[in-house]
Design a protein with these regions (language model features):
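Phosphate-binding loop of NTP-binding sites
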Residues: 81-185
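N-terminal leader/targeting and accessory segments in enzymes
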Residues: 1-83, 87
Length: 185
């Protein structure tokens, strides 16, 4: 949990606590920041009221809106999301040597082999889920949205991983999910 003032400058932000980051209004819980990213079929600005009704403490937008909670206006919410998530989770990507695997075929196989070759100090993130010596969980997307991705990075770091073998989809590059990352390989 962080104060909103640790993430953004603004009057009164010292009194607002942030519990998490969400881009899906249906998943918002009290204290979350709701980031209004734009997707192929939906513009999350259209779901601000739903997010607020579920307890969003703040909304991040890239156009002027009227709402009953603090609003942070940025140039581009899709580009802002990985920066915000990195900061919220205390820059976990800086503690991982990330090995990114991209391509049409073979990403899962190559990422899995790399993780197994490196051993317990290496996590895996991709089609098979998020996997390390301390957890093994399914995920929805090969490369999740940044609100989830940086949460996973933090979990890998907290579990003792030094390396991460990660499938990187073209969609993730296109959607700015990987903008803030420096790949070692």
């Amino acid at each position: 949990m962080k104060k909103l003032s640790e993430l953004y400058e603004g009057e009164g932000y010292d009194n607002i606590w942030v519990k998490g980051i969400k881009i899906n209004s249906k998943e918002v819980e009290p204290g979350d920041i709701f980031v209004c990213v734009k997707g192929v079929t939906a513009d999350r600005h259209d779901f601000i009221e739903e997010a607020i009704s579920k307890g969003a403490s703040c909304v991040v937008v890239d156009r002027s809106v009227t709402c009953s909670v603090p609003m942070v206006k940025v140039k581009n919410t899709n580009e802002e999301l990985p920066l915000l998530a990195s900061k919220f989770y205390d820059y976990p990507e800086k503690y991982l040597d990330i090995i990114g695997i991209t391509g049409t075929n073979g990403k899962t196989t190559v990422a899995t082999i790399i993780q197994e070759l490196i051993g317990d100090s290496c996590g895996y993130l991709g089609t098979n889920g998020i996997i390390c010596s301390k957890f093994n969980e399914s995920i929805r997307n090969t490369t999740p949205d940044s609100d989830r991705l940086y949460n996973y990075f933090r979990r890998f770091v907290d579990s003792g991983c030094k390396y991460l073998s990660m499938e990187t989809s073209s969609e993730a590059f296109y959607r700015h999910r990987l903008d803030n990352l420096t790949f070692k390989v």
